[in-house]
UniProtKB/Swiss-Prot annotation:
It comes from Pseudomonas putida (strain ATCC 47054 / DSM 6125 / CFBP 8728 / NCIMB 11950 / KT2440). One of its GO terms (molecular function) is tRNA binding. GO terms for biological process: protein quality control for misfolded or incompletely synthesized proteins; rescue of stalled ribosome. It catalyses: an N-acyl-L-alpha-aminoacyl-tRNA + H2O = an N-acyl-L-amino acid + a tRNA + H(+). The record marks D95 as: Stabilizes the basic form of H active site to accept a proton. This is Peptidyl-tRNA hydrolase. Pfam families: Pept_tRNA_hydro. Keywords: Cytoplasm, Hydrolase, RNA-binding, tRNA-binding. The keyword tRNA-binding applies. The record marks N12 as: Discriminates between blocked and unblocked aminoacyl-tRNA. Belongs to the PTH family. The active site is at H22. It is found in: Cytoplasm.
């Protein structure tokens, strides 16, 4: 079991993107930082907002890239390479079109599924895709042509409340994730109902 050393929350920078569906991963990391009572601060060296906390004697680093989504890998690779963090010790939280709002799932490895942030992370990590993902459901607009405006839009209140609940569920299983007990975390998280 590999303990998680880096948790990344994907999103786009700037106030115009705050609270958009595409920033679900960044919202997760913001909530995690708050729960751990640490402040995310800008760090130009890693092209993002960073923080650190300790869990069972191990450092866990938080990162929200401040590059745009399609350049997220630049930020992740800079921090991971500097601290010699292997892909299997990274958890990337991101929005997921293929899951309904209120559903969160953990996954290890796999492709990018059309997600530009994941695509760039895989490329910047030398085509290694063996990192863990926290997939936060945002739903799908029903037509591929509508996806861009959908993910860059704000969710209606009922949808946002479901996303918030899925983030709470994910935060609840985080101790198991941090310890590397993904089987237990997945059982608990995947049994939650939206």
């Amino acid at each position: 079991m590999t303990a998680i050393q880096l948790i990344v929350g994907l999103g786009n920078p700037g106030p115009e993107y705050e609270q958009t569906r595409h920033n679900a991963g960044a919202l997760f990391v913001e909530r995690l930082a708050s729960a751990q009572r640490v402040s995310l601060t800008a760090d130009k060296k890693y092209f993002g907002l960073t923080a650190k906390f300790s869990h069972q004697g191990n450092d866990v680093r938080l990162l929200i890239p401040t590059t745009y989504m399609n350049r997220s890998g630049q930020s992740v690779a800079a921090l991971a390479n500097f601290f010699r963090i292997k892909p299997e010790a990274i958890l990337v939280a991101h929005d997921e079109l293929d899951l309904p709002p209120g559903v969160a799932k953990l996954k290890r490895g796999g492709g990018h599924g059309g997600h530009n942030g994941l695509r760039d992370i895989i490329a910047q990590l030398g085509n290694q895709n063996d990192f863990h993902r926290l997939r936060l459901g945002i739903g799908h607009p029903g037509d591929a042509k509508l996806v861009s405006n959908f993910v860059l839009g704000r969710a209606p209140r009922a949808e946002q409340e479901k996303l918030d609940a899925s983030i709470d569920f994910a935060l609840g299983v985080l101790p198991d994730v941090l310890a590397g007990d993904f089987a237990k975390a997945m059982r608990e998280l995947h049994s939650q109902k939206a």
